[in-house]
Amino acid sequence: MKLQELFSKYIYNWTLLLFIFGGIILLNIIASLISFKFDMTKDHRYSLANGTEIFLSKKENIESRISIQIYLEGNLPSEITNFKNAIKSKLKDFKSIAGNRIEYIFINPNNGTKDAQNELFAQIYDRGQGILPLEISYLKDGEQRQVMIWPGAKMSYSINGIIKESSIQFLPGTKPGSPYGLAQMTDIIENAHNNLEYNLISAIRKLTQKEKKRIAFLHGHGELNLYQTQRARAL
């Protein structure tokens, strides 16, 4: 009788252990299939606004693919790297809703030969109409260092054979020879974090905005007056 009880207890313990391991494996499988995260920040920095989700989900808002090139890559100060990761996370959230209508890539503008770099810098800068460079002075391993970064993104969108392009400036540019210290950048980066989603979705909205057809109204030949055409003008 005692032997039977020991055997039953042995079987019970092993069965319980198998159930526990099976449950853990099942939870891991479910977690890999379902993407979710909890936002515990006061300003819900890591959650998308409802208006953003609605806009991205509607195919009529983004009819074809938007290509986004972000020029924050390479050997960067940790504060800038953290901000870069925030951009990457936000764009990943955008893509999870918009699917292949949004594509993005992070580019190191300092790769390649000096001539290739200068050519890319000129394209990014676009005579002051594109992304403005930012010089940062910081201390690393007891040595004062200086780096020039391009804290922005280029966006392109093709619709009906027409290519539209625009730029986003995430962090302000600096004058040549007047770098920011990392201590000065703290509030600037924090503000950029807070406005990141707004700046991204605003740029996408502007880029994909459909042109309104204009209607011309003639006067003086018996046509409807200004009051009578007011509703049509509002369309």
Where are these regions (language model features)?
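Short, surface-exposed patches at the edges or C-terminal ends of soluble domains, predominantly
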Residues: K2-L235
